[in-house]
Amino acid sequence: MENIPIEDQKWRRGQITFNRHFAASIKKMREMALSNKDYDPARLFKWGQMMSLALIRALKAVEKNLGAPGQKVINQVLIELGREIGQEVLRDFVRLPQTKDIEVVSKFVTYINEEIWASPEIPLIINDQECLCDVLWCPHQDHYQAFDCRVQRYIVQGLLEAFQEKTGIAVDAQFTQIIPKGAKTCQFHMRLISPQEEREWNKYSAQLAAKALEKLKEKSQNE
């Protein structure tokens, strides 16, 4: 198969154009690391996996030692990170006039999966209000327990907030199945909502946060 050069500045699919995040540092990485024939790209995975494990372990330690206030600080940091990345990706966002809102949503989700989570996916537009995708492989699937995946939800929350602010399109999200629970894919369902509607995504994240603290409370009582 012919290797097609990747444009590090822009990401284009059909009628949609986004910026690629971290473009300047990616250029440097290609020049100083990937251009070296002795450099194994799998090293990036191992480094990134270490950092992802550090994040979930840091969250658990903060929850154990500082409780709800500490948990809230970590979660807010992740939301803000998601917003920053989303704003960078959407800064020069372009859509052709005939593009439907759900097409924009579907392409943004593809960018999230492929470029932010490094995950191959199969997208599907169901109708003018809904779309979904099947994530075929997740970098965390062999290292995170199912409950650990909650840490990523706050980054997604920030991404969705940035998306609504830039495009005016309000969207909610739901995972219907995940690989760490034994499913073949992680399935991600998206639907358009009114701008005033609270996201079920955020509500469920709050439930998981409360559950994490409750687990710690039960564990301490049983020790």
Positions of the model-derived regions?
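N-terminal accessory segment detector
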Residues: M1-E130, P139-I155, A162-H189, I193-E223
